[in-house]
Amino acid sequence: MSKDNKNIVITSAVRTAIGTFRGSLKDMQASDLGALITKAAMEKSNLNSNDVDELIMGQVLTGTAGQNPARQAAIQAGISIEKTAYVINQVCGSGLRSVAAGYQAIMSNDSKIIIA
């Protein structure tokens, strides 16, 4: 590591419930679940929604979710419409890739606070 690396920390960990295909969560939209966990992550970290620079959400089955479910979740969670949000679909690796993308955005000075 170079001498000018930043100290980047994960301040909380929250995830959606794990369900089964066509199970008890089938009537919930991914954006609604995303909004719930985004609010929970902000609460656990004592973050104001205005502090968040970007939301990166891992989602695999996006077929009926509408345009950019991460953006929908961010807006529902109270994150400003001026902030960015996007979905990563990398099957089983979507969540981990979201965290890695958040780290990269912070390291490159594109963002300071990311929810992934």
Question: Locations of the language-model features?
Answer:
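Short, conserved beta-strand segments within well-ordered enzyme catalytic domains
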Residues: E54-I56, V87, I114
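Active-site nucleophile and cofactor-binding loops and adjacent substrate-binding regions
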Residues: G66, A85-S94
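Conserved "HGTGT" condensation-loop signature of ketosynthase/thiolase-family condensing enzymes
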Residues: M1-K83
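Active-site-proximal alpha-helical scaffold in enzymes
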Residues: Q90-A116
